[in-house]
From Swiss-Prot:
InterPro entries: QCR7 (IPR003197), QCR7_sf (IPR036544). It is a peripheral membrane protein. This is Cytochrome b-c1 complex subunit 7, mitochondrial. The gene is QCR7. Component of the ubiquinol-cytochrome c oxidoreductase (cytochrome b-c1 complex, complex III, CIII), a multisubunit enzyme composed of 10 subunits. The complex is composed of 3 respiratory subunits cytochrome b (COB), cytochrome c1 (CYT1) and Rieske protein (RIP1), 2 core protein subunits COR1 and QCR2, and 5 low-molecular weight protein subunits QCR6, QCR7, QCR8, QCR9 and QCR10.
Length: 127
């Protein structure tokens, strides 16, 4: 069974609240992010989430228009950069403080709505 974004967010919160796990996992995660290279293409982490599922489609529809345009621009620019086999100039790389989860709140909201709808669709009435 694939994990939901809600469960992944809970695991992340648990790791960040635990001092031992935080000291162990955060440096590894930061190194992984640096090696992944998506920031060098001008992408944020939320730009990498696959769009081909109903939850993500709902979250993208709920995204504010200006953020949606910024997302599309970042993705198109990254594709163009990849086609030319270059990286963006260092001053255009996404910095760690700029890489905030702009889409995750909408994904969690859409997941909660889908879960509630599923529970209501499968409700059993007992006497």
């Amino acid at each position: 069974m694939p994990q939901s974004f809600t469960s992944i967010a809970r695991i992340g919160d648990y790791i960040l609240k635990s001092p031992v796990l935080s000291k162990l996992c955060v440096p590894v995660a930061n190194q992984f992010i640096n090696l992944a290279g998506y920031k060098k293409l001008g992408l944020k982490f939320d730009d990498l989430i696959a769009e081909e599922n109903p939850i993500m489609q709902t979250a993208l529809r709920r995204l504010p228009e200006d953020e949606s345009y910024a997302r599309a621009y970042r993705i198109i620019r990254a594709h163009q950069t990849e086609l030319t086999h270059h990286l963006l100039p260092r001053n255009e790389w996404i910095k760690a403080q700029e890489d905030v989860p702009y889409l995750l709140p909408y994904i969690l909201e859409a997941e909660a709505a889908a879960k509630e709808k599923d529970e209501l669709d499968n409700i059993e009435v007992s006497k």
